[in-house]
From Swiss-Prot:
Keyword tags: Cytoplasm, Methyltransferase, S-adenosyl-L-methionine, Transferase, tRNA processing
Binding site for S-adenosyl-L-methionine: L78, G100, L122, S130
Protein's name in the database: tRNA (cytidine(34)-2'-O)-methyltransferase
EC number(s) recorded for this UniProt protein: 2.1.1.207
Catalytic activity: cytidine(34) in tRNA + S-adenosyl-L-methionine = 2'-O-methylcytidine(34) in tRNA + S-adenosyl-L-homocysteine + H(+); 5-carboxymethylaminomethyluridine(34) in tRNA(Leu) + S-adenosyl-L-methionine = 5-carboxymethylaminomethyl-2'-O-methyluridine(34) in tRNA(Leu) + S-adenosyl-L-homocysteine + H(+)
Gene: trmL
Any GO CC annotation of this UniProt entry: cytoplasm
Cell location: Cytoplasm
């Protein structure tokens, strides 16, 4: 129903948690190289538990290859520099949610490929830098899925 893109993720447990999230929500996960870890990393596998076999995951050599694979899809960049609040967007089946690396977020040249209404920011208290990557992915994905009455869930 939805896709999540992790652009150059750095921290194995975050990606492992998102693998588990995707497996439990029927979401396809896209990883854009370079990755900050091996897909055989113990922490990645531990965080994802035994959900790796249930996750639909694709690894892309670079951002351009990922965009080509998702051509024609509506894409949203999750960024602290966004202005659109996640709860005000009417998400559609097939939407794609793009997240940047944990320590620096999406680079400006990637963010600039998204219109302002497709740059999404999750609300948080002032003077805080950002939310955890896997938590942000869960918040956004569950809001989008909720809008579709949790289609396919038990």
């Amino acid at each position: 129903m939805f896709d999540i893109v992790l652009y150059q993720p750095e921290i194995p447990p975050n990606t492992g948690n998102i693998i588990r999230l995707c497996a439990n929500t029927g979401t396809r996960l896209h990883l854009v190289k370079p990755l900050g870890f091996s897909l055989e990393d113990k922490q990645l596998k531990r965080a994802g538990l035994d959900y790796h076999e249930y996750a639909n995951m694709q690894v892309h050599e670079n951002w351009e290859a990922c965009c080509a694979a998702l051509a024609g899809r509506r894409m949203f960049a999750l960024t602290t520099k966004g202005s659109a609040r996640h709860s005000t967007i009417a998400f559609q089946e097939g939407d794609v949610f793009v997240f940047g690396p944990e320590t620096r977020g999406l680079p400006e040249e990637i963010r600039d490929q998204f219109t302002p209404e497709h740059r999404v920011r999750l609300p948080m208290m002032p003077n805080n830098r950002s939310l955890n990557l896997s938590n942000s992915a869960a918040v956004l994905l569950y809001e989008a899925w909720r809008q579709h009455d949790f289609a396919g869930a038990v």
